[in-house]
Swiss-Prot record:
Taxonomic lineage: Bacteria, Pseudomonadati, Pseudomonadota, Betaproteobacteria, Burkholderiales
Family: Belongs to the class-II aminoacyl-tRNA synthetase family. ProS type 1 subfamily.
Gene3D superfamilies reported in the protein's UniProt record: Anticodon-binding domain, Bira Bifunctional Protein, Domain 2, YbaK/aminoacyl-tRNA synthetase-associated domain
Listed PANTHER family: MITOCHONDRIAL RIBOSOME PROTEIN L39/PROLYL-TRNA LIGASE FAMILY MEMBER, PROLINE--TRNA LIGASE
Native organism: Cupriavidus taiwanensis (strain DSM 17343 / BCRC 17206 / CCUG 44338 / CIP 107171 / LMG 19424 / R1) (Ralstonia taiwanensis (strain LMG 19424))
Protein name: Proline--tRNA ligase
Length: 573
């Protein structure tokens, strides 16, 4: 391909609303153009990268035995109402009506539609297992689209759905997809981690997220460097910091703490370590009998993990209590709350670490007062104990193999074991060997195709622009002739190299735009093509051209007779 037949539109400066590196560089490189909030045109350079990503995903999905189909972007509300997600999804699900006032959803995922296909087409155990996948446009009506394509509203996603006879079959399908994802991300040439995760709104019994490691990642990735343990922050298990509770050494004392409403203020006022304080978090659950108030206790230097809190029996649909509810239950305003002398029945849940603390400090349920020397069993009943907190670096790894570290990651893939969550609600059944009706066991497996672009850039860039991994670069090689429109020798040699690389199946572009060398080089460094060949009169007089890899600090001279072989050998490696 020649640049004059392509479309290249680069910018010297990023738009003012571009926040992160990938957004800035994609806009500057002319890969995307903003059309609306969270909605982008994918320009030719960007679309070439998307197609490279899609091809790798498609090859590995086919290799894994999945079958490609395509499901509608617009889906009837009735299917979503069958599973309850029509209401549960909230405003992120874009709803619309047609001219007949019938309700539809713009798909964010396609569990309902694919389950409808399965229940219509699959009758017997002989038709299982099967795994359907699509690469399709999705839409989520994000409240605050940001970071370019990283958190856009319209995006391209590969979503796959497996159907099995039993849980053993589901486990095999899940492992098959997990292995396929590992191959996919390795082929992309990205540093990534697969981590244990929570299933979230999709539901099910087990899941892993695939994260591209990047300092700018939104997600915290917890891992043990001396073992295989890895999880996202929501799912990472926090062990108690001491194995056994020490015996009390202090008396319970109601202590004056004037206007000290934060744990840090209390610790400083009492001249005690922050980690001896316990903070109170008040939640509520609603029922026909009225709200139930819950008191969650976390060590003052730790943070509540809301996903873990929702897994405490009875707290699945919690909300944070109102100030009126707090005053009514505790007789005190926030800032002085604790588990002693509460005014109404409150369910007390202590984090594992708090449950093993002794002689701790907490609110006294009285303005300007806290209790010191608090001990379980002596001063208040033993609590419900649960893992409620986020882990911190240095915590013991749950597998007992070392301590935990935390890095940042960008989620680009997710695999779920759904079980019968959808098949039961939509009556997707089959007849087993004994003629008995059974619900299908389902798994679902997503990869954010367009998000891969942003994640790859966040991991691979420098001050000059993008550095694409070879497998997903828009072009493998760019030929930059200096004076292409002025020198017959330069034109002839550039055309020869271009033709030979094309004949060898290399994805190459020749820049015949007639731009000055500085502009030409800057454009291709910004766009991030991995290999560059420069042809000029000065080098040709010595029978040489210049080769430079995108990560190379300096160019090297290569003979004109060897340059095609040199580039091909680099591509092969």
């Amino acid at each position: 391909m020649k640049a004059s037949q392509f479309f290249i539109s680069t910018l010297k400066e990023a738009p003012a609303d571009a926040e992160i590196v990938s957004h800035k560089l994609m806009m500057r490189a002319g890969m995307i153009k903003k059309l609306g909030a969270g909605i982008y045109n994918y320009m030719p350079i960007g679309l070439r990268v998307i197609r490279k990503v899609e091809n790798i995903v498609r090859e590995e999905m086919n290799r894994a035995g999945a079958v490609e189909l395509s499901m509608p972007v617009i889906q009837p509300a009735e299917l979503w109402q069958e599973t309850g997600r029509w209401d549960k999804m909230g405003p992120e699900l874009l709803r619309l009506k047609d001219r007949h006032e019938r309700d539809f959803a713009v798909q964010p995922t396609s569990e309902e539609v694919v389950t409808d296909i399965a229940r219509s087409e699959i009758r017997s155990y002989k038709q299982l297992p099967v795994n359907f996948y699509q690469i399709q446009t999705k839409f989520r009506d994000e409240r605050r689209p940001r970071f370019g394509i990283m958190r856009g509203r319209e995006f391209t996603m590969k979503d796959a759905y497996s159907f099995d006879r039993d849980t053993d079959g589901l486990r095999k399908s899940y492992e098959n997809m997990y292995d396929a994802y590992v191959r996919i991300f390795r082929r992309f040439g990205l540093e990534f981690r697969a981590v244990a995760a929570d299933n979230g709104a999709i539901g099910g019994s087990g899941s892993h997220e695939f994260h591209v490691i990047a300092e700018t990642g939104e997600d915290a990735i917890v891992y043990c460097p001396t073992s295989a343990y890895a999880a996202n922050m929501e799912a990472a298990e926090a062990l108690p910091l001491v194995a056994e509770r020490a015996a009390p050494t202090q008396d319970l004392v109601k202590t004056f703490t004037p206007e000290k409403v934060k744990c840090e203020q209390v610790a400083e006022f009492l001249n005690i370590p922050l980690e001896t304080n316990v903070k109170s978090i008040v939640l509520a659950t609603d029922s026909d009998a009225g709200p139930q108030i819950w008191l969650l206790l976390i060590r003052a230097d730790h943070e509540l993990n809301e996903v873990k809190a929702s897994k405490v029996p009875g707290l699945a649909e919690f909300r944070f209590a109102t100030e009126n509810e707090i005053v009514e239950a505790f007789g005190s305003p926030p800032g002085y709350l604790g588990p002693i002398d509460m005014k109404k029945p409150v369910k007390v849940v202590a984090d594992r670490t708090v449950a093993n603390m002794s002689d701790f400090v907490c609110g006294a349920n009285y303005r300007d007062y806290h209790y010191t020397g608090v001990n379980w069993g002596r001063d208040l009943p033993e609590p419900i104990v649960a893992d409620l907190r986020n882990v911190v670096a240095g915590d013991a790894s749950p597998d007992g193999q070392g301590t935990l570290e935390i890095c940042r990651g960008i989620e680009v893939g997710h695999v779920f074991m759904l079980g019968t969550r959808y098949s039961e609600s939509m009556n997707a059944t089959f007849l087993d060997e004994n003629g008995k009706t059974q619900p299908m066991q389902m798994g679902c497996y997503g990869i954010g195709i367009t998000r891969i672009l942003g994640a790859a850039i966040e991991q691979n860039f420098d001050e000059r622009g993008i550095i694409w991994p070879a497998a997903i670069a828009p072009f493998a090689v760019v030929i930059c002739p200096v004076g292409y429109d002025r020198s017959e020798a330069v034109k002839a040699e550039a055309d020869r190299i271009h033709a030979e690389l094309l004949a060898a199946g290399v994805d190459v572009i020749l820049d015949d735009r007639g731009e000055r060398p500085g502009v030409m080089f800057a454009d291709w460094e910004l766009i991030g093509v991995p290999h560059r060949v420069v042809v000029g009169d000065r080098g040709l007089k010595e029978g040489k051209v210049e080769y430079q890899g995108r990560r190379d600090a300096q160019a090297t001279a290569v003979s004109v007779a060897e340059v095609v072989g040199h580039v091909r050998s680099l591509l092969a490696n």
